[in-house]
């Protein structure tokens, strides 16, 4: 199913595992729990990766939309 808007894509991904790339070069991989109109997201069972390598595991993370690429 194709999405016309970014929020539609996020809504379709709710409850699924996603990767979020951050401006600082890190990637967060986790299950999308919630989001808002500013693209702030809440992820569960998060893994933080740097250059593809696992750095650490984080339980739940709130990610500000302005830090996401």
Can you say where each PLM-predicted feature lies in the sequence?
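Conserved RNA-binding domains used in RNP assembly and mRNA/RNA metabolism
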Residues: 1-69
